[in-house]
Amino acid sequence: MKPAVIVSAGAVLAAAAVVALAQASGPQASAQELTFLGQPVTAEDLRLGEAVYVANCAACHGADLEGQPDWRRRQEDGRMPAPPHDASGHTWHHPDQALFTITKGGVGAVVPGYESDMPAFEGALSDAEIAAVLAYIKSTWPERERAFQAEVTANDEGGS
C-alpha cells in the first residue's frame, strides 16, 4: 500500500472515532427540547438545576449522576444506596410528577412507610429549584431515555 493511502485511511478512521465518541457521550439536550411538568425549560433553568444538583444531590448521587456503588443492593441498615440519575439508573422510567413528588416529599410520599436516606427537600428547596434540578437531570439523558420518559410522563398526565 502507498503511504498516502495509509495516511488517508488513518485520518478517516480517526475522524470516525471522534464522531463515535461524540455520539456516545451524547450532547446535553438543549433547553428548547425539554419540558418539565408540561412547562418549557430554559437555559437559565438548566444552569440553576446544575447548581442545585451540585449543592444538594451530588454528594450521594455522584458528581456525574452515577449513583452510589452497588446501588441495587440493600445496605446493612436495609436501606437502598442512592441510585444513579444517568441513563444507567431508573430515574428516566418515572413521570415528571412522581420525580417532583419524591424530591419534594421524600420517597415515603410515593411509597408510604418506605425508609430512605434521601431527605424530603420541602422547605429546603423551592418548587422552582426542584423543577430545575430535575430538568437538569433530564437534560443529561440520551435521546432514547428522554423520549421514553416523555412518553411515560404523557401517559401519567392522561396524554397519548
Question: Which stretches of residues belong to each language-model region?
Answer:
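Periplasmic/extracellular electron-transfer cofactor-ligation site
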Residues: 43-44, 50-81, 104-114, 140-147
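Hydrophobic membrane-insertion alpha-helices, especially the h-region
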Residues: 8-20
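Gly/Gly-Pro-rich "capping" loops immediately C-terminal to redox-active cysteine motifs
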Residues: 66-100, 119-125
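Solvent-exposed, acidic/flexible segments
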Residues: 39-42, 46, 50, 92, ...
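Electrostatic cytochrome c docking/interface patches
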Residues: 24-52, 147-149, 156-160
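An amphipathic alpha-helix signature
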Residues: 96-104, 127-138
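Positively charged n-region of N-terminal signal peptides that target proteins for export
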Residues: 1-4
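Axial heme c-ligation environment in periplasmic c-type cytochrome domains
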Residues: 73, 83-84, 105-131, 148-156
